[in-house]
Every structure is written in C-alpha cells, then in structure tokens.
Curated annotation (Swiss-Prot):
Family assignment from sequence similarity: Belongs to the argonaute family. Ago subfamily.
Record GO cellular component, one term: cytoplasm
Protein's job: Probably involved in the RNA silencing pathway. May bind to short RNAs such as microRNAs (miRNAs) or short interfering RNAs (siRNAs), and represses the translation of mRNAs which are complementary to them.
GO biological process: regulatory ncRNA-mediated gene silencing
GO molecular function, one term: RNA binding
Designated gene of the protein: AGO4A
UniProt name for this protein: Protein argonaute 4A
Location of region: Disordered: 1-33, 143-166, 871-890
Protein source organism: Oryza sativa subsp. japonica (Rice)
Biased composition (Low complexity): 144-156, 872-885
Domain PAZ: 274-388
Annotated Pro residues bias: 11-21
InterPro entries: ArgoL1, ArgoL2, Argonaute_N, PAZ_dom, PAZ_dom_sf, Piwi, Piwi_ago-like, RNaseH-like_sf
The Piwi domain, residue ranges: 557-865
Amino acid sequence: MESNSGEIEELPPPPPLPPNAEPIKTDDTKKLSKPKRALMARSGCGKKGQPIQLLTNHFKVSLKAADEFFHHYYVNLKYEDDRPVDGKGIGRKVLDKLQQTYASELANKDFAYDGEKSLFTIGALPQVNNEFTVVLEDFNTGKSSANGGSPGNDSPGNDRKRVRRPYQTKTFKVELNFAAKIPMSAIAQALRGQESENTQEAIRVIDIILRQHSAKQGCLLVRQSFFHNNPSNFVDLGGGVMGCRGFHSSFRATQSGLSLNIDVSTTMIVKPGPVVDFLLANQKVDHPNKIDWAKAKRALKNLRIKTSPANTEYKIVGLSERNCYEQMFTLKQRNGDGEPEGVEVSVYEYFVKNRGIELRYSGDFPCINVGKPKRPTYFPIELCSLVPLQRYTKALSTLQRSSLVEKSRQKPEERMSVLSDVLKRSNYDSEPMLNSCGISIARGFTQVAGRVLQAPKLKAGNGEDLFARNGRWNFNNKRLIKASSIEKWAVVNFSARCNIRDLVRDIIKCGGMKGIKVEDPFDVIEEDPSMRRAPAARRVDGMIDKMQKKLPGQPKFLLCVLAERKNSDIYGPWKRKCLAEFGIITQCVAPTRVNDQYITNVLLKINAKLGGLNSLLQIETSPSIPLVSKVPTIILGMDVSHGSPGQSDIPSIAAVVSSREWPLVSKYRASVRSQSPKLEMIDGLFKPQGAQEDDGLIRELLVDFYTSTGKRKPDQVIIFRDGVSESQFTQVLNIELDQIIEACKFLDENWSPKFTLIVAQKNHHTKFFVPGSQNNVPPGTVVDNAVCHPRNNDFYMCAHAGMIGTTRPTHYHILHDEIGFSADDLQELVHSLSYVYQRSTTAISVVAPICYAHLAAAQVSQFIKFDEMSETSSSHGGHTSAGSAPVPELPRLHNKVRSSMFFC
C-alpha cells in the first residue's frame, strides 16, 4: 500500500486471535469459494410514465479531507486478571477513559469505536505503545452486598463498610492492534456516484461515528437506529410494553453521491417504573396476589433495575425460591467480643430492622435476585424499578401490534417535519470525527425525478373492463372473469354470536350477482356448547366427527365460522385437518359487520381457492406482455418466514409459489417446507433422493407448470425473492439460483431456460414526498435515479395508494437478467404484477407472487404448534442441517388441494 509520500508502506501482520474469539458462523452449509456470477450493472433508466418531481429523506453529504486514511485497530479488552470483558456497554466506558487518560500518548486523536472489537482513527496512532491500563473509579460491580442488598451465604462480611462504599475501582487492560488502512478517497468516489472496493468499509466507519455520537447522548442503539429517553417519544401498547419512537440514520452511496438517509424508526421497550407495576400490566391482573411468579421470572430475566434508596443499577438473574418473609441468608457481623459470626436472618427482617426501610407489601412475594448462581443477592420487589430504554424482544400480541401500527402512523407532511427536526437536533456538525473528515451534511431534502406509470387495464367477466382509479377498483354490477361453483359444501360454526342463516343467504345472493353458482349447503354443523372450553385440537376433532356423521359424503368446500378473526387458536388445527388430512378447501370467517363489501371480499378468496379467477390483466388476455407472453415463462415468488422475536428455536418456513397455465400470470400454486431456525437462505430448493427423485421445492412447481401449460416447459424463469439484505445478494445469486438450475437439469439435462432474478425489499428507510402536498405519492410512482445504487440495477416503486401514514416504496434489485428486459418493460411488468392479487380490489405494495409466498408460509406454519412438533417430529419425519438438531417437517398438503390457491 502506498503512503501519502508515494512510498510503499509495509503493513504489520494481522493481530493474533484472542483466546475467547469465536469464528463467524455462516448460515449456509455451502461455501462460496469464488462467486460465479456478479450483480448486474444498470443498463439504462426507464422513460415511460408521467414525470413528477419528488423529495426524498436523503440529505447530501460533502467531503473535504479525501486524502486522509481511516486507521482500523482491533480492540482486545480484558480485566486485570486477563479475563475477557464480555459485558455490553463496558467497552465504551473503558475506551472513553482511555482517551482521557492517555490523550497525549495517543496524539490527542479522536476515536470512532463500535462498542465491540473495532476502533478507528483518522491517521495512525503513535507506535509508542499498544497496551494500556485503564482504571474506572466509579465502576458498578453489580454486587448488591456492596450497595445494601442482602448478600447470599457465601458473601464476605463487614456489610456496614460496604454500604458506605457503593462503588469501587476496576482495572482493565486494553490492547490496540493495527488491522487496516481505509482510504477516505473511497468516500470521494462515492460522492462522484462511483464505488470502489473500499467504499462500503469507509461508509461503515462514518456510520460508526454516527452511532458513537448518539451513544454519547445516552441513546439506546439498535443497529443504525437511535432512541432517546424522552417520554414524548413513548406510546403505551399495553401489557407493560411501550413503543419508542426514534430515528434511523445511515450513509448511503447513491447515483448522485453520498447521502445521509434519515427516517423515523420504532422499537419496543419495557415500560419503566416499579417492577410490580410492570408485572401487573404484563399479566393483565389487578393485584400482586394474582401474579403468576413462574411467568414473572421469565419476563424479568436479564432486565435491568435500579434499587432504592441507593439508586444503583443491577441486572435481574431470577427470583428467590421463598417469599421475602421466609427467604433466609447469613448476615456476617461482629459479636460482643468483636469476633465475626454469622446470623441467619430473613431478607424482610434485614431491610426493615438493619436498614430501617419500611416495606409495605413485599413480605408475601419473592425477592428479586441480582447475584450470581452460587451467591444470590436479594432485594424486596417494592424497592426495584425497571430502568428506561430496555428493549422488549418478545412477540407482540395481535392487539399490541394493531395499537403500534395505529399510534406510529405519520402523514407525509408530519414525517417531513419530524425528520427536519431530527437532523437539526442531532447536531452532527459538532461531532469532532466528522469535522476531522471534512464531512458536512446538507439540511434540505434531496430532489429526485420520478415517473407515474399508467395503471394496467383489467378485465372482468363477460369481457367487461375494470378501471383502476388511484390503485382501486370494484366489482359493482360486474361478474368475475372465471367464476367457480360452490357445491357440495357445508358450514361449521365455532361461534355462538353469528347468524348463520343470514350469512348463507347473503353469500348465495352475492355469489349469483358475481357469476358464482352457490348451491344450498348440505348442512350447518354447530359446535356443542360444552366443547367451547376444550383445547383447540379437541374442538376441531369433535367438529370433524360431528360433520362426518351428519354429511352424506366428504364436502368439496367448508365455510368455517370463528368467534375471533385473529386470536383464534382454532385456525391452525382446522386448516391442518382440512388441507393436509382431508384435502378440503376451506374459508375461515369471523364476521362482525356483514355487508355487501364484506361478502364480496369473502367470495373473491373462495373463488380463487376453488380454481376461479376474479380479474385478469388485459395484456394477459391478449396476450401481449413484453418478453413474457410470446415465450413460455414461469414466475416464482420466494420467501422465508421466521419465528416471532424471542423464539430462536422455532423452525423457519420457506415457501415458493409459481405461476401456472401460461400465458396467465395471475394464477399460482405453492410449495412449502420447514428449515433451520433463522436461516434466511432457502436450503430445500433442490434435494435429490438418489438418481431418480428430487424432493426439493422447485421440482413439483416445474412439473405443475408443464402439466397446466399443455406440456410445455418454461423457456424463461422470472424469480422474485423477498426478505434478503444486500449482504446476501451474492448468496441468492450463486447458491439459490444454482439450486434452481440444478432442479431444471435434474428433470431434463438438455433444458437450459433463461433466468431473471429480482430481489424485493420493504425493510429499508427511503421515503418519497410530493413537495407542498399533504398527500402521498400517487400509485405507480417509480424512481430509478439519484438515490438508487451508483452501479447496480435497482429502482423504487410505489405501486399502491398509501391511504394511511406515509407510503413505503418497494426497493427492487435486478441481480441477474438473461431474458433481456429493458428498464421500461421490467418496471411495467412489476407494476402489473401488483394488480393481479386475487384477494383484493386494490393494487398492492409488492408483486403478488411475493405476497402469495408470504401467505403460504404463514398459513402452513400454523398447521401445528412447533412446541408440539419437537415432541412428535419422529412421526412427521425430519431433516438435519449440518451441525444442528433435526428440523421437524411440516405436514404435506393433500393431493386434492396441492395445486390450488389455498393461501388466498
């Protein structure tokens, strides 16, 4: 590497790995030795559509010190006895103290520290010393006997002396080893809309500077999002959980240079305050006597508290086995002769008599344990309060989720105002490291040029046209383009509130108006009232038994009436019985207000499930979709859904849907499998079982396309992949695509279709605004310039009408394109595929195949509870990923429904 003087500078060897370091584990068993395919570059921008001027929440960045270098140092942090430091949050305190103590030895350099193992400076540190001793004088040891708590049996004596000394010094060893030089010129290249091999590394450094800047302001850091301890940012979601509004902030390399992307962000936190209040809210009880302490122990573990009166912070490790009156410990003190002795005393007695603290209600309840496994340390629960800004990482309830969505909405104008204020209050101009880099950030939103694509024309029954206005249409006085028949059907009623007679009458009447022939149901099977408190699986089995006795034969369709729309524990077992065991199409409803619109929406789902179609694109019926209608083309949508937060051992569910009956692009079927928890790459696309069998997800979809399309193989494959980050693009391109190609070759070695691979991302922070308007951007808005990638082929699209809050565009990345789409043709195809979602009469925010894959994974995952699967996986079979326990397999769909749109 060259130094500033032009001489070749020899870098020292990399530092040795510390003894506690663990190698990074990838989530794929296949390794990428050398990528065979690279991400494709942009070939041009689209031109179709009505031009529109927009603003975006990217703020332009300028750089003056492009000739400087970031120096990266590996941080090895140990205690005085050489034990590694693994506690989060300690590193920043130690490095801050290091900077203060050794300022002159470190040439008064400012640091950018990531809080873990990496430290960055501008220019090199003096090579005088790389080992430092740091003493924190106010270090909180977390031993509660040092702060007036009741110590466990093994704690040393002299408690009174410890009470007078709530903090103690702690000595650390810090070792800094040079790792790399990163040129700031890489950022300068990004400013010119280019990228070098160091660009992402350099951008990572200035992102770390932003994180450090926010950490010094006392923010909670969650990746690139920052949350202040400000009650005005909190919204109560119930159950002891609060939504905390903060902001996301990250640098992005774009076509128009480097920009700072700022957006509103929300995380969930535990409601701060008395521990008892949290438990009452969390368990929805009105008195501490009703608290389930086993649940309380799980809810409180690892949360941080402050104790009164010392106001010292600890981490909860558990609860005492006995209540405060009965939990004993050995109090070490001196007797009348001055000799040390141990006296057995209860926690309650210690705090009341020895400490003189009045306890009003703690006596009958467990104590909070903040000690160690063999040395517990207890506090009465009423002396403990949860500290602010602690993330809540468990799954939210349905009510909490809906409350969060409702309370987090912001209209475009309000969001712009909030973001302007955030940038102003962040005061990045005062950050020394940014100043040393010569980085300055513009205060105004970046202007971008967008285009509004015309809504595709739709066809209903009898050749009638459907006209989408603002991304919406309706079937008033119109028939469905391919109406099915609802025959040999029955109603099962798990709800005591629903008027089944009126519901059936309305379905028959509305169905007739839409062209669906609806026969009278065989029967209405009512649940026995005595079963309503039974477990869900028993209720379903009881209903199936009753149905089989009353019906003349197996029905083709079942309408299932539930008491609740989203909280019903009947849904999963019922779907499994119908779809996996019996092969019966079923529609679940939980009607509250039954009107024509509600019945129509239900019929749209039923019609699609039974093989009908509600509407089609006009270019589908012509057929005249560029590059798709003339050559047999299959469209795949792929997604992986994971267990809820806090459920790290729940298998992930991979789903792939595929189009069928080419040249249609509106009809799909699904293939679903379970795989290792949290594994984002789909590992079951191609699974050869010997020389003749392939049990992967793709094979059955290719065979279905062949049989439904007049025995024609697809010569083109368009893949839409959801849910992967930019760092995983190469894996999708070189692992998943390889598996799909292998699945094709396994069917026919001479078959070589062309592939186009597109990733869709919703989890990003770019938003668009119409200047001077209170409204969202119009549906069909596309942006493929300015804030897009400097080299790679990507674009943003808002296909839907944002009726509530601020529209979030979908970010499409074209990784690979052998078919050869122009920018206009591909953007038009993506836009059109947002109008073929058979469940609704609106354009949706992402292409329908991805939505269907998400729905299929979500529905099949409810077939069985995974805590039950772990006990019964041997009966279902299972597969093992390398180095992990067997993953329970999901029940397979019955042959009768496998090719249906059961997920609608």
